[in-house]
Curated annotation (Swiss-Prot):
Family matches, as Pfam families: Ribosomal_60s
Alphabetical GO biological process terms: cytoplasmic translational elongation
Family the entry assigns: Belongs to the eukaryotic ribosomal protein P1/P2 family.
Posttranslational mods: Phosphorylated.
UniProt signal peptide: none
Gene3D superfamilies found in the cross-reference section: 1.10.10.1410
Species, as recorded: Eimeria tenella (Coccidian parasite)
Domain of life where this protein originates: Eukaryota
Record's keyword terms, sorted: Phosphoprotein, Ribonucleoprotein, Ribosomal protein
Protein function: Plays an important role in the elongation step of protein synthesis.
Protein name in the entry: Large ribosomal subunit protein P2
GO cellular component, one term: cytosolic large ribosomal subunit
Length: 114
């Protein structure tokens, strides 16, 4: 994230196509460690792209990511409320539910550089 922030600071400073050296000059005075491989990956990925276009593309991708969960949590509560007066059976019923399998941590289709 520090590389992206330094890259964007360089762009805001008027350099539309910062190099690795430009970004390093932003990071080094504040004592940030610079990993040349990570920095090269960022510079290569941003090659030929305008920062504002990459940000816009990222926002569009974020809008497509499901982040709900409210409907799934509300369903058992609504069922318990509709069930009537026996709240202990509703509590037992929710305990019997199997835990959801964890999804793999991936980019969730959010790669900005595709």
């Amino acid at each position: 994230m520090k590389y992206v922030a330094a890259y964007l600071m360089t762009v805001l400073g008027g350099n539309e196509a910062p190099t690795a050296a430009d970004v390093s000059r932003v990071l080094e005075p504040v004592g940030a460690e610079v990993n040349p491989e990570v920095l090269k990956t960022l510079i290569d990925a941003m090659q030929g792209k305008a920062a504002h276009e990459v940000i816009s593309a990222g926002l569009e991708k974020l809008q497509k990511v499901p982040c709900g969960g409210g409907a799934a949590a509300a369903a058992p509560a609504a069922a318990a409320a509709a069930g009537g007066g026996d709240s202990s059976s509703a509590a037992k019923e929710t305990k019997k539910e199997e835990p959801e399998e964890e999804e793999e941590d991936g980019d969730m289709g959010l790669s900005l550089f595709d």
